[in-house]
Design a protein with these regions (language model features):
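ATP-binding/phosphotransfer module of carbohydrate and carboxylate kinases, centering on a glycine-rich
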Residues: 1-112, 117-142, 258-395
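Short glycine-aspartate micro-motif
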Residues: 76, 86-90, 143-147, 212-216, ...
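Short, acidic, Ser/Thr-enriched surface-loop or helix-capping motifs
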Residues: 102, 156, 226
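Glycine-rich phosphate-binding loop and adjoining helix at the ATP-binding site
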Residues: 107-117, 121-211, 334-346
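Glycine/GP-enriched mid-protein hinge/lid loop-to-helix segment characteristic of carbohydrate kinases
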Residues: 110, 120-121, 171, 180-290
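Short glycine-rich anion-binding loops that position phosphate/pyrophosphate groups of nucleotides
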Residues: 151-153, 218-220, 328-329
Length: 395
């Protein structure tokens, strides 16, 4: 009997989290639509919606054009302007990018804190605290939590970066323990490409794609696999997949890693070496390649290498869709089409099912990089509602 009570409580909390996810990821939604999509009874919908209204998490509004709605006008449910907000920080080697956003990842405040080339573990942690303080000082709404997205292998249970390369002289960093000393809200840490994949899942192509591979081209190369609308929690370090055992030595200790050939810095270095033109970011490199055949050839060869790396993932997981994000979002459509053709010509797993892999660009574009930090907290809310007191119940 005791176990039954526990299970019932968990079911109620799970139902609350599910309905909140449906409301957060929709511009607006009716109670009837909630019942259909959640497969919960109208009575359950009514009870939970009324609780959310009382807690000022959501509001009910009539549709803009009531004349077109026959019969009783269905009220639209939306996230309330008084609901809690989320703090997000994206940590890169050059800058800390901060944001305060709503439960629908609409930005309210954005602040950046540049990093020097001589940062240490102590200075990085202190600057994270400074930026968080600056962000929360500009909102009087309750803070749901802080999400930090970063490169590296992350232990999400402890909030520790367990291994990171090319990040000053830092190899490990305990973010949660340090920041939890200063803030009462929960702190969550996630690999930045995993975070971007969550953003794509909740607010991008994931709304229609249940299974996909998200590929992020940055200082390195990382990938995240979503199967059955669940993010697989392996490290996703695609860039450290060796494609040439006799190639140059990587910072990870291996040889011929993919990121030495197809990451953003490697592409920029190769263009400079072959054209004499120094470029500083992917956007300028793509523009230059449109008018320079040598630079275009660098892109072509690098993306051919990346295609083999993507194909290895597809052969393992048989996902039909590849979403290109971070700097790979900037790739010319012609290059993306060539990559898709190349992968289709060598892929085995999808061919077995008579299907062809599809490459598409992120629906949210470059915004997934920062908004993903917000989605780290949303994932906890949607999948583990008991982390947040307003979803727990004593019924």
């Amino acid at each position: 009997m005791e176990n039954s009570g526990i299970n019932l409580t968990k079911a109620k909390e799970a139902n609350r989290a599910l309905l909140l996810q449906l409301i957060c990821t929709s511009e607006s939604i009716t109670r009837t639509e909630l019942s259909v999509r959640s497969q919960l009874s109208p009575m359950t919908i009514t009870n939970i919606v009324n609780e959310f209204l009382a807690q000022k998490l959501i509001v009910e509004t009539p549709p803009e054009d009531t004349a077109r709605v026959p019969g009783r006008t269905p009220m639209l449910l939306q996230i309330s302007p008084d609901s809690p907000v989320i703090v997000g920080i994206r940590m890169t080697i050059h800058c800390l990018y901060g944001i305060v956003g709503t439960l629908t990842v609409h930005p309210i405040i954005q602040k950046d804190l540049p990093l020097s080339d001589k940062e240490t573990e102590e200075t990085i942690l202190d600057k994270l605290r400074q930026l968080t303080d600056a962000l929360i000082a500009e909102t009087d709404r309750p803070i749901l939590g802080l999400g930090i997205s970063t490169a590296g292998v992350i232990n999400q249970e402890t909030g520790v970066i367990e291994y990171i390369t090319n990040f000053f002289d830092i190899k490990t960093l305990d973010l949660r323990s340090y920041l939890s000393q200063f803030f009462s809200f929960p702190v969550f840490v996630c690999n930045e490409v995993h975070a971007a994949a969550l953003c794509e899942l909740y607010f991008g192509h994931g709304q229609t794609e249940n299974d996909f591979l998200y590929v992020g081209l940055t200082h390195g190369i990382a990938a995240s696999v979503v199967l059955g609308r669940r993010l697989l929690s392996f490290c996703g370090e695609m860039g450290h997949m060796s494609i040439d055992f006799h190639g140059p030595k990587c910072a990870c200790g291996s040889h011929g890693c993919l990121e030495l050939y197809a990451s953003t810095p490697s592409i920029l270095r190769r263009i400079t070496a072959e054209t004499g033109v120094e470029l500083h970011d992917m956007e300028s490199a793509v523009q230059f390649a449109q008018t320079n055949r040598t630079a275009y050839a660098v892109f072509y060869n690098a993306m051919r290498q990346l295609s083999y790396g993507i194909n290895n993932y597809l052969n393992l997981h048989s996902v039909p869709t590849v979403i290109l994000g971070h700097d790979s979002y900037l790739l010319p459509d012609e290059i993306v089409a060539q990559m898709e053709d190349k992968i289709a010509s060598i892929n085995i797993s999808m061919h077995h099912f008579g299907a062809r892999p599809k490459l598409i660009k992120s629906k949210l574009g470059m915004k997934t990089q920062l908004y993903g930090a917000l989605c780290i907290v949303l994932q906890q809310l949607f999948q583990n509602g008991t982390t947040f007191s307003f979803l727990s119940t004593n019924d």
